[in-house]
Amino acid sequence: MEAAEGSENYDGIQVLLSREVIDTAPQCPHGPTLLFVKVSQGKEQGRRFYACSACRDRKDCHFFQWEDEKVSQARLAAREEYNKSHQPPMTHAEYARSFQEFTALPLAKRKFCCDCQQLLLQTNWETHSRHRVLGDISLSQLKRPSQLLHPLENKKANAQYLFADRSCTFLLDTIIALGFRRVLCVGTPRLHELIKLRACKGTTPPIKSLLLDIDFRYSQFYSEEEFSHYNMFNHHFFGGEAAKLVCQKFLQEEDGNGALLVTDPPFGGLVEPLAFSFKRLREMWKDSNPENANNLPIFWMFPYFFESRILQCFPDFAMLDYQVDYDNHALYKHGKTGRKQSPVRIFTDLPLDKIVLPASEGYRFCSVCERFVCSENKHCDICNRCTSKDGRSWKHCSQCKKCVKPSWSHCSACNHCALPGHPCGTAGDGCFLCGGKGHKRRGCPHLSVSADGERMKRNLKQRSIKGNMKKQPTATTSKKKKRKRNNPC
């Protein structure tokens, strides 16, 4: 068994990744599950278990199975039936035929159900008569499905934050300037839309794009050559081998030349499974020319504080200063300053000096670092580089021998820089509660002696309060219990 390539041993839950594990893993509605294990002091603790690759909360996907658990044939059959029942109601080919019928309708008969997020043919009107329905859907609206569809906003599953037009335009202009002519859009529907819109207008060199996304709703708007239902956390094509071949053919056109992978994963997702999937996509690209020493170039959008994790998986990557903005995120928007700026950056293996950041948005070229940086990112002569990560001017600490955030100061007790007023001695690899080594807070003996007694008292008190309320069970709660019993996972 191999751990994620480049992953470090750390306390907590760790994912174990290999091609063999994913190919033989049990499946949930989101494809092959991932194998996890609890790790303490770099060593496995307890039994390994399978859980959903896409959802971090068991409320969103109930799947759980011990690695060594014996599963009956009846349970396997029930699980397979359950997985099938949670797939899209139509195949991609059926959606494509429906879309052709829809576009042939006159404007007055083109309707979209806002509640079901579905394009409606006349045969569906009666079924959706009590729903919120949008009429007169124009052809231009059909070319911008990300503006028609409600973004998925579950932060622990498939949260969709869509590029603002400013960032999307910058990305496409940069892609064109770098000479790429085919873009594999993994979780970037806005970029896919813009590429297709510009291709229709003929205002830019011809660029092709293929969208891979876990949101099957895009099947309503794009053909099988334009979109594949895909889970980037386990490299699973829901359309099977046919969809995988479409992607492989797209990557291998012109012997793989001129192709670029652009991805914008959910920020709460594990870095290691994502990197594993991107490496699998690189392998698909390389099959066209196995002797090619190069790799499929990547633009990976992710918060800057994941830099170390990404560099563990891709040591040849570097982070751009460009701040990626989103339309439907309260904080990640252009124009904010200081710590409220968007923390999302672009990680890439392309030469940084070739990527020009717009001066109109406050970026400048550092001749020493040979790359474009944020205007507030001052060059440190001691570190010999522009050191800021968050858009503010950082300061050099001679004792730490590195630049730190402007709000930090050196703590002689901790022997490193931190926020003023921080609790000394709680940082590090030991226990947060007592500061001891060899265990974490959950396994602290002091917690079991003192805190557990108080917690038990609180629980008993809460139970007595609930008992006194004499609340009658509602229909909704009984339904929830029934659903839980019927779940085969």
Swiss-Prot record:
GO molecular function annotation: nucleic acid binding; rRNA (adenine-N6-)-methyltransferase activity; S-adenosyl-L-methionine binding; zinc ion binding
Keyword presence, Ribonucleoprotein: no
Segments forming CCHC-type zinc fingers: 429-446
EC numbers: 2.1.1.-
GRF-type zinc finger locations on the chain: 28-70
Source organism superkingdom: Eukaryota
Binding residues for Zn(2+) 5: 397, 400, 410, 417
Binding site for Zn(2+) 2: 113, 116, 128, 131
BP-aspect Gene Ontology terms: positive regulation of translation; rRNA methylation
Catalytic activity line of the entry: adenosine(4220) in 28S rRNA + S-adenosyl-L-methionine = N(6)-methyladenosine(4220) in 28S rRNA + S-adenosyl-L-homocysteine + H(+)
Subcellular location: Cytoplasm; Nucleus, Nucleolus
Protein keywords: Cytoplasm, Metal-binding, Methyltransferase, Nucleus, S-adenosyl-L-methionine, Transferase, Zinc, Zinc-finger
Main location per the UniProt record: cytoplasm
GO CC terms: cytoplasm; nucleolus
Binding of Zn(2+) 1, residues: 28, 30, 52, 61
Domain DHHC: 381-431
Ligand binding (Zn(2+) 4): 380, 383, 396, 403
UniProt record similarity statement: Belongs to the ZCCHC4 family.
Domain commentary: The regulatory loop blocks the catalytic center by bridging the methyltransferase domain and the C-terminal CCHC-type zinc finger, resulting in an autoinhibitory conformation.
Functional note: rRNA N6-methyltransferase that specifically methylates the adenine in position 4220 of 28S rRNA. N6-methylation of adenine(4220) in 28S rRNA is required for translation.
Protein name as it appears in the record: rRNA N(6)-adenosine-methyltransferase ZCCHC4
Classification of source organism: Eukaryota, Metazoa, Chordata, Craniata, Vertebrata
